């Protein structure tokens, strides 16, 4: 039996219909020598500081730099503690059973860095050693799936893609965990979240918000010239803007006296 793992149930159903896996089981579809299963996005991620013995926010703990990152099922917060998501744990058990029974694995997670990481984290967390190949497609039509299955690629070709995603994941953890705790301790009240991506994004939003609040409308003038060519009337606007009417009028007189205009751009609209 071959196992095909997709990133989400809807994709798995599309692949299953192509390979003839139409018998529904708990967490997968089976038939014609295939078991088509799925993740729900990231089933496995990096463990929180508590897994390394660091409880609470304490200055003496910082920076938290794990010698080796631990993988755990996706967790949800209950009160002040994180617990494994029960639905994720169930699906991981389904995957463990299928991986143990299969001859090989076809990786059908999304064709990209995060899709690669989703599978590799599950594969490593379960301690799987079965060989795997990659279904690399950007379309989910039946034709694209069949073509991709005829041209499966060696999983090792995507090792560097996985390492890139792994480095991103660990960098996010190091920056997010340590910076958030340091910021919260420095502020002295509440919990403040800081992240490698979220904080620069928030800074851009705040900057735009301040610009909007500080914006003061001002009046400016542009020159409009109406003319005709080949019996077609049209108007031309100057690119330059003038802060006062006097400057605009002076430039208009200059153009009027010269009698010539230079067309710098043309836009066609229907």
How does the language model describe each region?
Residues 129-130, 177-182, 208-213:
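Short helix-capping/linker segments at secondary-structure and domain boundaries
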Residues 1-169, 173, 250, 260:
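Intrinsically disordered, low-complexity regulatory segments
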Residues 124, 173, 177, 199-203:
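Short, residue-level hotspots on alpha-helical faces of the histone-fold
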Residues 1, 109-111, 188-193, 267-270:
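Conserved short loop/turn motifs at secondary-structure junctions
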Residues 164-195:
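Amphipathic alpha-helical segments of the small helical/lid subdomains adjacent to P-loop NTPase cores
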């Amino acid at each position: 039996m071959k196992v095909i793992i997709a990133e989400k149930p809807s994709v798995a159903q599309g692949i299953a219909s192509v390979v003839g896996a139409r018998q529904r089981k708990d967490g997968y579809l089976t038939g014609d020598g295939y078991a088509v299963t799925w993740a729900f996005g990231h089933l496995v991620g990096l463990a929180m500081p508590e897994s390394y013995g660091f409880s609470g926010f304490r200055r003496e703990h910082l920076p938290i730099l794990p010698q080796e990152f631990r993988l755990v099922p996706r967790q949800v917060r209950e009160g002040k503690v994180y617990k494994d998501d029960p639905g994720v744990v169930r699906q991981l058990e389904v995957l463990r059973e299928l991986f143990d029974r299969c001859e090989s694995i076809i990786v059908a997670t999304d064709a990209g860095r995060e899709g690669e990481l989703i599978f590799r984290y599950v594969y490593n967390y379960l301690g799987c050693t079965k060989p795997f190949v990659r279904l690399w497609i950007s379309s989910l039509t039946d034709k694209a799936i069949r073509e991709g299955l005829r041209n499966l690629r060696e999983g090792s070709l995507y090792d560097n893609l996985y390492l890139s995603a792994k480095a991103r994941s660990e960098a996010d953890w190091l920056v997010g965990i340590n910076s958030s705790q340091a910021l919260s301790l420095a502020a002295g009240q509440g919990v403040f979240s800081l992240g490698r991506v979220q904080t620069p994004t928030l800074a851009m939003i705040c900057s735009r918000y301040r610009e909007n609040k500080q914006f003061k409308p001002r009046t400016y003038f542009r020159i409009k010239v109406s003319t005709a060519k080949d019996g077609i009337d049209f108007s031309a606007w100057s690119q330059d803007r003038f802060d006062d009417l006097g400057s605009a009028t002076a430039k208009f007189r200059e153009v009027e006296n010269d009698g010539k205009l230079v067309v710098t751009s043309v836009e066609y609209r229907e």
